[in-house]
C-alpha cells in the first residue's frame, strides 16, 4: 500500500462566469471518486435538457443542488487525486455562504485556484472594480491562503483561438493585480486551459504548444506540502456536547492545533473549567492521540453537560491554556455593509465555532488594505471597501486568539442583516484570568 498520500484542501475562486464549475467538475470527473454510472445518468439528463453546455459543470450543479437541499452528498464526490495528493475542494463560491464558510471554514485551504475567463469582455468583467475576482483573491490572501494557481480558462474561445497574445496580456494584468493584493506573482503558475475542451487540464495540449509550463494537474502536484500545526499548544473548539448513557459527558469538536490524548488535563475556555480526559474517540474507535484536522469526541470526568457549550475551547492546562478575551484588536475589511460603521456598532462575530455579539468599541485606524499603511487615526467611521484596526469587546465570555499564533481561532466573519458584512483577522488579545473556575478532583490529583 505504501505511504498514504497527503491530503490538501483547495478553494476554487473567480468571477461568476469564469468556468469554475466546468473546470472543477472536469477534474473531479477525470480524477475523482464519482461513480461512472452517476456520470452517465447526469449526461443523459443533460442531453434531455439540451444542456450540451456540459456534463462537467452539470456534475457540479447536481452536487450543489443536492447539497443545498440538505441532502448530504458523499463528500468523496468533491475529492480527486493527483500523483502526490488527495485533493478536496472545500468550497466553490457561488454558494451563498461562501465567504462565511471560507472564514469560519471547516478547514483552511492550502491553495486557491483562481479561474480567469480569457474571452474578450469576459476577462474585463471579472477583473473590473466590482468583479468578484478581486474580492475573492483579497479574501484568500487575508485569510492566509498563501499559495495560488491561476488558470486562464476558455482559451478555446479567445480570438483567435488559443491566442498566446491574449494569454500574455492576461498574465500581465492579473499579476499586477495579485501583487497589489499581496501575492508574489513570480511564484504563481499561470496555466492556459479549457475546462470545457480539456486542454492542459490533465494532459498537455497541442493547441497550446507555445506554452511550456505545467498543466493544471502538474501545478497541483507542485503545491508545497502544508505544515500541520501539531507542535502548537492544544486548541479544540467544541461543536457540541453530548450526554451518553453509561459513559457521561462527551464534548465533540475538531482539533485545530496541538494534540489531545487520554489522561491529559484540559482547561475549557472561557470558563476555566479544568478536568481530566478519560478517552478520545474518532468514528467510534478509541484513539491514543488526536491530531489537527481530526474530528473527535472525548469523555471528561465529573463534568455536567450544562457546564460546557458550543464555542468553548478545550486546551492543555499546562501549556498556554485558553482564556476568556476581555477585548481584542483586529484588522477588519468591510465587504458588504450598506451604511457606515462607527464606534458602538454591535454585530455578531462568527469565529471558530462561537457565534457571539461583539461591540466595536473603538475604531483605532483606517488602513490601506493592500499595503497595510495607516491612512487615518481614529476615523469617525468605516464603509464598504475600507480596512481598519478595530478594538472589539465581546458581550458574552468568548475565546479568541491571534491569527499569527492560532490561525483558525484568529479569523472571523462579521454578520449583520443575515449576511457577512466584514471579515477580519485578530492582531492581539487582552485575556483575563478565570475567577472561581471549577477544577474536578481528577484534575486536582494530577496537578
From Swiss-Prot:
Q: Where is it mostly found? A: cytoplasm
Q: What keywords were assigned to this record?
A: Cytoplasm, Elongation factor, GTP-binding, Methylation, Nucleotide-binding, Phosphoprotein, Protein biosynthesis
Q: Where is this region: G4?
A: 153-156
- Record's superkingdom? Eukaryota
State the InterPro entries in the record: EFTu-like_2 (IPR004161), G_TR_CS (IPR031157), GTP-eEF1A_C (IPR054696), P-loop_NTPase (IPR027417), T_Tr_GTP-bd_dom (IPR000795), TRAFAC_GTPase_members (IPR050100), Transl_B-barrel_sf (IPR009000), Transl_elong_EF1A/Init_IF2_C (IPR009001)
This chain belongs to the protein called: Elongation factor 1-alpha
A Pfam family: GTP_EFTU
Stretches assigned to coiled coil: none
Amino acid at each position: 500500500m505504501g505511504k498514504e498520500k497527503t491530503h490538501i484542501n483547495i478553494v476554487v475562486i473567480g468571477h461568476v462566469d469564469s468556468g469554475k464549475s466546468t473546470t472543477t467538475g472536469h477534474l473531479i470527473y477525470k480524477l475523482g471518486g464519482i461513480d461512472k454510472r452517476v456520470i452517465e445518468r447526469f449526461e443523459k439528463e443533460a442531453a434531455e435538457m439540451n444542456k450540451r453546455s456540459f456534463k462537467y459543470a452539470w456534475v457540479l450543479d447536481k452536487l450543489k443542488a443536492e447539497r443545498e437541499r440538505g441532502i448530504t452528498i458523499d463528500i468523496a464526490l468533491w475529492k480527486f487525486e493527483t500523483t502526490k495528493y488527495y485533493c478536496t475542494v472545500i468550497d466553490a463560491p457561488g454558494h451563498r455562504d461562501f465567504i462565511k464558510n471560507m472564514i469560519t471554514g471547516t478547514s483552511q485551504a492550502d491553495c486557491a485556484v483562481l479561474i480567469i475567463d480569457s474571452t474578450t469582455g469576459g476577462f474585463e468583467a471579472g477583473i473590473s472594480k466590482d468583479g468578484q475576482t478581486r474580492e475573492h483573491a483579497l479574501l484568500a490572501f487575508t485569510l492566509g491562503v498563501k499559495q495560488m494557481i491561476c488558470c486562464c480558462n476558455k482559451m478555446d474561445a479567445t480570438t483567435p483561438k488559443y491566442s498566446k497574445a491574449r494569454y500574455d496580456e492576461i498574465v500581465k494584468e492579473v499579476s499586477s493585480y495579485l501583487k497589489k493584493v499581496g501575492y508574489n506573482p513570480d511564484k504563481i503558475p499561470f496555466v492556459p486551459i479549457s475546462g470545457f475542451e480539456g486542454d492542459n487540464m490533465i494532459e498537455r495540449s497541442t493547441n497550446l504548444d507555445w506554452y511550456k509550463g505545467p498543466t493544471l494537474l502538474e501545478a497541483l502536484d507542485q503545491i508545497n506540502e502544508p505544515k500541520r500545526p501539531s507542535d502548537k499548544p492544544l486548541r479544540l473548539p467544541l461543536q457540541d456536547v453530548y450526554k451518553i448513557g453509561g459513559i457521561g459527558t462527551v464534548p465533540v469538536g475538531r482539533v485545530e492545533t496541538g494534540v489531545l490524548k487520554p489522561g491529559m488535563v484540559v482547561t475549557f475556555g472561557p470558563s476555566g473549567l479544568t478536568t481530566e480526559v478519560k478517552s478520545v474517540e474518532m468514528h467510534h474507535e478509541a484513539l491514543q492521540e488526536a491530531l489537527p484536522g481530526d474530528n473527535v469526541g472525548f469523555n471528561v470526568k465529573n463534568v455536567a453537560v450544562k457546564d460546557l457549550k458550543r464555542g468553548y475551547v478545550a486546551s492543555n492546562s499546562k501549556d498556554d491554556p485558553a482564556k476568556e478575551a476581555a477585548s481584542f484588536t483586529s484588522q477588519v475589511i468591510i465587504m458588504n455593509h450598506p451604511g457606515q460603521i462607527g464606534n458602538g456598532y454591535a454585530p455578531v462575530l462568527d469565529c471558530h465555532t462561537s457565534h457571539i455579539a461583539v461591540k466595536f468599541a473603538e475604531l483605532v485606524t483606517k488602513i490601506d488594505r493592500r499595503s497595510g499603511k495607516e491612512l487615518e487615526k481614529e476615523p469617525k467611521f468605516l464603509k464598504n471597501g475600507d480596512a481598519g484596526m478595530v478594538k472589539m469587546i465581546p458581550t458574552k465570555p468568548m475565546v479568541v486568539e491571534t491569527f499569527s499564533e492560532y490561525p483558525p481561532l484568529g479569523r472571523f466573519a462579521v454578520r449583520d442583516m443575515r449576511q457577512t458584512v466584514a471579515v477580519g483577522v485578530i492582531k492581539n488579545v487582552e485575556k483575563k484570568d478565570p475567577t472561581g473556575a471549577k477544577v474536578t478532583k481528577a484534575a486536582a490529583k494530577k496537578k
